[in-house]
From Swiss-Prot:
Gene3D superfamilies: 1.10.8.60, P-loop containing nucleotide triphosphate hydrolases (3.40.50.300), Winged helix-like DNA-binding domain superfamily/Winged helix DNA-binding domain (1.10.10.10)
Binding site for DNA: R312, R317
HAMAP family named in the record: DNA_HJ_migration_RuvB
Domain of life: Bacteria
Described purpose of this protein according to its UniProt entry: The RuvA-RuvB-RuvC complex processes Holliday junction (HJ) DNA during genetic recombination and DNA repair, while the RuvA-RuvB complex plays an important role in the rescue of blocked DNA replication forks via replication fork reversal (RFR). RuvA specifically binds to HJ cruciform DNA, conferring on it an open structure. The RuvB hexamer acts as an ATP-dependent pump, pulling dsDNA into and through the RuvAB complex. RuvB forms 2 homohexamers on either side of HJ DNA bound by 1 or 2 RuvA tetramers; 4 subunits per hexamer contact DNA at a time.
Entry's free-text remark on domains: Has 3 domains, the large (RuvB-L) and small ATPase (RuvB-S) domains and the C-terminal head (RuvB-H) domain. The head domain binds DNA, while the ATPase domains jointly bind ATP, ADP or are empty depending on the state of the subunit in the translocation cycle. During a single DNA translocation step the structure of each domain remains the same, but their relative positions change.
Residues covered by region (Large ATPase domain (RuvB-L)): 1-183
GO CC list: cytoplasm; Holliday junction resolvase complex
EC number: 3.6.4.-
Main location: cytoplasm
Subunit structure: Homohexamer. Forms an RuvA(8)-RuvB(12)-Holliday junction (HJ) complex. HJ DNA is sandwiched between 2 RuvA tetramers; dsDNA enters through RuvA and exits via RuvB. An RuvB hexamer assembles on each DNA strand where it exits the tetramer. Each RuvB hexamer is contacted by two RuvA subunits (via domain III) on 2 adjacent RuvB subunits; this complex drives branch migration. In the full resolvosome a probable DNA-RuvA(4)-RuvB(12)-RuvC(2) complex forms which resolves the HJ.
Binding site for Mg(2+): T68
Annotated source species: Chloroflexus aggregans (strain MD-66 / DSM 9485)
Gene coding for it: ruvB
Protein name: Holliday junction branch migration complex subunit RuvB
Length: 350
């Protein structure tokens, strides 16, 4: 999958630089995810009222929905410092120990991709989260002894796109677990308008709405598209993003009315044209598209499932009637129920 794909919800280096300037600082500035925000507001107010660290918190959901932003907001609301790291970055137990021993009372430790922590690191994290203690082994061989080092009370905020990959012991140590969902069109419009204001881009309400509704319910994608449409407006128009300018730019970027790009349409056409609409196994589909299995599961499928264009069945992926209609293809009337169909092209599910 190309790193330049606009509707890829995963972050890249350019996104990270811009996102810092666009990131909300308080819960009142955070747009969308109303249930999560309200629960956090109550939890933060209670923790501050008791002068305690916030309970360990886990955010999960598709990428680009604001898990890192919420972690920063929580730290700001708590008046605490935040240390940001990720599961793959903590390779050894000693790496985690070094981070933990530098935390101050009520600090926030944000671990992105927390499901990718290795087992040795998790073993160190368990007592740190539960007892606010660090168990160290001093020495080697018969003379080795265990030493427990007390830690200040702090908050671990974990973020993951793959909740099922978290081990049960780690998941159980998060007191609060919040699921982030795709944003509504109204919230996306508000996010685009806010980002344009911060970036100094003139935009009409209709232009903001057009970008927002094609951004797949994902703020990161909306902000990325906004920057590209801004460039188009600057060069082709008078610099203002109107409805007409937004539509012209999005057409040039090959992002359709529902936010699908050519890669999404290629996946749907592959299922329909190469595998008779499915079912087709994930590995088979990945091979046909020359894509990674993880890319299909993490990047393509969540939004296609949300739209109802794709179904996951025990025997593989299936394109729905909606997918056929969106691509302008006739939907075949099946003589047998889907679960009874067979064919040499179905592949394997895993």
């Amino acid at each position: 999958m190309s790193a330049e794909r606009l509707v890829n919800p995963h972050s890249d280096s350019d996104d990270q630089q811009v996102e810092k300037s666009l990131r909300p600082r308080t819960l009142s500035e955070f747009i969308g995810q109303e249930k999560v925000v309200e629960q956090l507001r109550i939890a933060i107010a209670a923790a501050r009222g008791r002068n305690e660290a916030l309970d360990h918190t886990l955010f999960y959901g598709p990428p680009g929905l604001g898990k890192t932003s919420l972690a920063n907001v929580v730290a700001n609301e708590m008046g605490a410092k935040i240390k940001i790291t990720s599961g793959p970055a903590i390779e050894r137990a000693g790496d985690l120990a070094a981070i933990l021993t530098n935390l101050q009372p009520n600090d926030v430790l944000f671990i992105d991709e927390v499901h990718r922590l290795n087992r040795a690191v998790e073993e160190v994290l368990y007592p740190a989260m539960e007892d606010f203690a660090l168990d160290l082994v001093v020495g080697k061989g018969p003379g080795a002894r265990s030493l427990r080092l007390n830690l200040p009370r702090f908050t671990v905020i974990g973020a993951t796109t793959r909740l099922a990959l978290l081990t049960s012991p780690l998941r159980d140590r998060f007191v609060a677990v919040h699921r982030l969902v795709f944003y509504s069109d109204a919230a996306m419009t508000e996010i685009v308008s806010r980002s344009a204001r911060i970036l100094g881009v003139p935009i009409s309400p209709e232009g903001a709405r057009e970008i927002g509704r094609r951004a797949r319910g994902t703020p990161r994608i909306a902000n990325r598209i906004l920057r590209r449409v801004r460039d188009y407006a600057q060069v082709v128009a008078n610099g203002e993003i109107t409805l007409a300018v937004a539509r012209e730019a999005l057409a040039q970027l090959e992002i359709d009315e529902l936010g699908l790009d050519e890669n999404d349409r290629r996946l749907l056409r592959a299922i329909i044209e190469l595998f008779n609409g499915g079912p087709v196994g994930l590995n088979t589909l990945a091979a046909a598209l020359a894509e990674e299995v993880d890319a299909i599961e993490d990047v393509y499928e969540p939004f296609l499932l949300q739209l109802g264009f794709l179904q996951r069945t025990p025997r593989g992926r299936v394109a729905t009637r909606r997918a056929y209609e969106h691509l302008g293809l006739p939907f075949p009337e099946r003589s047998l129920p889907l679960e009874d169909e067979s064919g040499p092209q179905q592949g394997t599910l895993f």
